Amino acid sequence: MQGVIRSFVSGGNVVKGSVLQHLRVINPAIQPSVFCSRSESTQPARMEESGFESTTISDVMKSKGKSADGSWLWCTTDDTVYDAVKSMTQHNVGALVVVKPGEQQALAGIITERDYLRKIIVQGRSSKSTKVGDIMTEENKLITVTPETKVLRAMQLMTDNRIRHIPVIKDKGMIGMVSIGDVVRAVVHEHREELQRLNAYIQGGY
């Protein structure tokens, strides 16, 4: 994955209860109270736009289908890390949205597989006795994007901050989440189409 990312980024320039026993879907109207000032809207863009740099996060979410349109897996701050990781494994995802117990519209943060590795495995802690709220990334520290954010900009944010999942915010509410895999696939797709257009031009197709 890092190899793919490096092929697009060089020197700052773009070449172009026990809950989780079952699937739970979060309310798309979830309202975070505060979002970090490091979000997409406040960081200076450092990436050059190219002809194919037109795909937005909204396009990425649409391509993922209904599962990404306001719905995602979640857990609560009181759930054990063990149950959270079990859910990630069962559903083949790398992160869960975290909400406050009994308040499905109150975003508390997110927990990722990286949180588990760094804060449980490396530190020798018990995943069965540690609560999600103890190791999650709190909502006021989240890096975020909007549906209008360009995919290359989102990829820059994710690589700069060394994160693999990023919440999508609209009107102060969280409407979804995309991963670095989603973003890279979108960039590769756009890059491939651009190369095809250039090839057609060279061969007289235009």
Curated annotation (Swiss-Prot):
A Pfam entry, by short name = CBS
Q: Which residues form the CBS domain?
A: 61-127, 136-194
- Drop me one GO molecular function for this one: cobalt ion binding
Q: Which SUPFAM superfamilies match?
A: CBS-domain pair
> Which CDD domains does the entry link to?
CBS_pair_bac_euk (cd04623)
Keywords on record: CBS domain, Mitochondrion, Repeat, Transit peptide
Q: Where is the transit peptide?
A: 1-39
Which GO biological process categories is it annotated with?
Answer: cell redox homeostasis
Where would one find coiled-coil regions in this protein?
A: none
Name a single GO cellular component. plasma membrane
Name the residues that span the membrane: none
InterPro entries per UniProt: CBS_dom, CBS_dom_sf, CBSX3_CBS_dom, Diverse_CBS-Domain
Question: What name goes with this protein?
Answer: CBS domain-containing protein CBSX3, mitochondrial
Species of origin: Arabidopsis thaliana
Protein's gene: CBSX3
